[in-house]
Swiss-Prot record:
This is U-poneritoxin(01)-Om4a. The keyword Disulfide bond applies. One of its GO terms (biological process) is defense response to bacterium. The lineage of its organism: Eukaryota, Metazoa, Ecdysozoa, Arthropoda, Hexapoda. It comes from the Eukaryota. Belongs to the formicidae venom precursor-01 superfamily. Expressed by the venom gland. Residues 26-39 form a propeptide. Truncated sequences of this peptide have also been found in the venom. It is possible they have been cleaved in the venom. It comes from Odontomachus monticola (Trap-jaw ant).
Length: 68
């Protein structure tokens, strides 16, 4: 049984839509990553992580979890 040309055309259009959607999603992810980098999120996270590392042992020591 041979598929009709309408079926083949539908499959081609469907596959093109899937490929376009995947390329568009990748481009949006790249744009989001670039926007976060420009906003300095990495530096902000580094500062926050430094504060956590600085104050967490002291807080755990006060709660009795870590011997100082």
């Amino acid at each position: 049984m041979k598929p009709s040309s309408l079926t083949l055309a539908f499959l081609v259009v469907f596959m093109m839509a899937i490929m376009y959607n995947s390329v568009q999603a990748e481009a949006l992810a790249d744009a989001d990553a670039e926007a976060f980098a420009e906003a300095g999120v990495k530096e902000l996270f580094g500062k926050a992580w430094g504060l956590v590392k600085k104050h967490l042992p002291k807080a755990c020591g006060l709660l009795g979890y870590v011997k100082q």
